[in-house]
């Protein structure tokens, strides 16, 4: 039960016109104020308190202070897409109080950063950089070590949050947080190896010294699919190198951004260091554009789509800044005629279905030698039947939801394109062998899909960010390599074979 207070206003926020109320209070204008400041609406969200989250959160950490003067957004669980919705059945009146059942609730609310918040944060970060770069690298490494330990202490809770808010299964959520911990360990070692060079000089009795100096501030813009691991890949190295970090997380995973920042902020505070060394913003394109344009940020790391990445690169280049870009992928697995078929089938399953096909390195194209084509395909179809789809927090689930309703709609559009090509009786048309439908539910669930298709089909050359696997034949290794390289995205590829000469030919 949720208790709501009843107030009387001239300009109401919300009117109730159900007959029991309007009959007895027909002369009054009613307004309700929802009181949920003290606890989460659902018990399964209560663990979020252990990592510093509440029903309402400020989404900007600037100058070592939490603030937020931008729009208020809602963090939604992709397994059920629940938003604030009150069930008015069995409504009871009790002396200016209402009690009724609430049937659907989002996870929490977040107040995003405004452009004013951004500017305040950047001013403080710019000043903090002067302090941080003067601290010896091994001591910076010690701070990163403490961050890693703080993450270890909250590994389970953070991993659970990743699964809850992003939608990947719990094992993947915990594994993602572990990646940051591992990067902290790596960066600690690196902090004692930032060596320069001694270079012989042409002048007698002279030598030249080369040493590394911090850039100052590194901007990190991360995507929803790996909402905290990508931060670790960038921030751990930036911090030990003496750079401050400005982080903008994905707008659809704000709670992860806040929880991670609270961990880092706690370590900085414990060591009496400026909180502005690590500045973070929850926000949308406006904040991302500000980072890309900001001349105080010499290096911007962006992870996301090729379309947006191109825009970021152009903006940063126009001010002669530097970019690190990790963009779209269209990854292939090549299975040669001598491969271990069972091993290949199991590996392809998780490569194509894991994270609901929303990894940058998801297997999207499966290239099978014609002599084993049907055998591998039969095994793959069999293991696809065993995929458990559902709540990513439940044991045994292998395929969670797509991250947003828009992603589910994009999956459906992609399937329609595949079907239309097949209906056109095109030599490049696709045939759906299994899956191919969204699952009727409140969540963003879709069926894992296998499509038999020509490598020349236009749809194969696009990145459909969903669990859709395109299967195609090849006759020779040369042909397989040509197919592998025939898409504009690339990013990663894999091979199954027992022959070293084939491996070396494949890797060039």
Description of each model-found segment:
Residues 2-4, 11-21, 25-87, 93-109, ...:
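Terminal low-complexity tails and localization/encapsulation signals of metabolic enzymes
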Residues 33, 79-87, 100-108, 272, ...:
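Conserved C-terminal structural/oligomerization subdomain of aldehyde/semialdehyde dehydrogenase
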Residues 129, 133, 148-155, 159, ...:
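Structural signal for hydrophobic packing residues in well-ordered secondary-structure cores
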Residues 152, 196-343, 474:
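Rossmann-like NAD(P) dinucleotide-binding subdomain of oxidoreductase/dehydrogenase enzymes
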Residues 266, 307-455, 473, 477-478, ...:
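ALDH superfamily catalytic-core signature
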């Amino acid at each position: 039960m949720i208790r709501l207070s009843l107030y009387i206003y001239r300009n109401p926020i919300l009117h109730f016109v159900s007959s029991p109320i309007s009959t007895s209070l027909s002369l009054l204008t009613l307004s309700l104020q929802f009181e949920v400041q003290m606890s989460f609406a659902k018990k399964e969200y209560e663990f979020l308190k252990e990592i510093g989250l509440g029903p309402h959160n400020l989404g900007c950490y600037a100058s070592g202070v939490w603030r937020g003067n931008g729009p208020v957004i809602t963090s939604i669980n992709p397994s059920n897409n629940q938003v604030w919705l009150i069930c008015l059945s069995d409504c009871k009146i009790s002396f200016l109080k209402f009690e009724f059942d609430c049937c659907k609730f989002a996870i929490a609310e977040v107040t995003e950063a405004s452009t004013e918040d951004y500017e305040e944060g950047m001013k403080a970060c710019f000043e903090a950089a002067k302090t941080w770069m003067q601290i010896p690298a091994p001591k910076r490494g010690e701070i990163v070590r403490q961050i890693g330990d703080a993450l270890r202490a909250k590994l389970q809770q953070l991993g659970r949050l990743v699964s809850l808010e992003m939608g990947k299964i719990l094992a993947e959520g915990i594994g993602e947080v572990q990646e940051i911990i591992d990067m902290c360990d790596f960066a600690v070692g690196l902090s004692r190896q930032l060596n320069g060079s001694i270079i012989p000089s042409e002048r007698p009795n002279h030598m030249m010294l080369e040493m590394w100096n911090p850039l100052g501030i590194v901007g990190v813009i991360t995507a929803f699919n790996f909402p905290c691991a990508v931060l670790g890949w960038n921030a751990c190295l930036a911090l030990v190198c003496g750079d401050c970090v400005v982080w903008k997380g994905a707008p659809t995973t704000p709670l992860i951004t806040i929880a991670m920042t609270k961990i880092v902020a706690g370590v900085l505070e414990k060591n009496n260091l400026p909180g502005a060394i690590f500045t973070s913003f929850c926000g949308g394109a406006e904040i991302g554009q500000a980072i890309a344009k900001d001349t105080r940020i010499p290096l911007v790391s962006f992870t996301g789509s090729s379309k947006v990445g191109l825009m970021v690169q152009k903006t940063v280049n126009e001010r002669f800044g530097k970019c690190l870009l990790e963009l779209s992928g269209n990854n292939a697995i090549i299975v040669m005629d001598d491969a271990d078929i069972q091993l290949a089938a199991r590996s392809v399953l998780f490569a194509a279905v894991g994270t609901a096909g929303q990894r940058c390195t998801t297997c999207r194209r499966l290239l099978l030698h014609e002599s084993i084509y049907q055998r591998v395909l039969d095994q793959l179809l069999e293991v696809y039947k065993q995929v458990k789809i559902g709540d990513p927090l439940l044991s045994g689930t292998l395929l969670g939801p797509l991250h947003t309703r828009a992603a589910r709609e994009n999956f459906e559009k992609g399937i329609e394109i595949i079907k239309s090509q097949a209906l056109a009786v095109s030599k490049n048309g696709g045939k759906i062998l299994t899956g191919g439908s969204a699952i009727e539910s409140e969540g963003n669930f879709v069926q894992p899909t296998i499509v038999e298709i020509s490598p020349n089909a236009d749809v194969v050359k696009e990145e459909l960010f969903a669990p859709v696997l395109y299967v195609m034949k090849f006759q020779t290794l040369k042909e397989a390599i040509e197919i592998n390289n025939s898409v504009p995205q690339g990013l990663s590829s894999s091979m199954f074979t027992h022959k070293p000469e084939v491996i070396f030919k494949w890797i060039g």
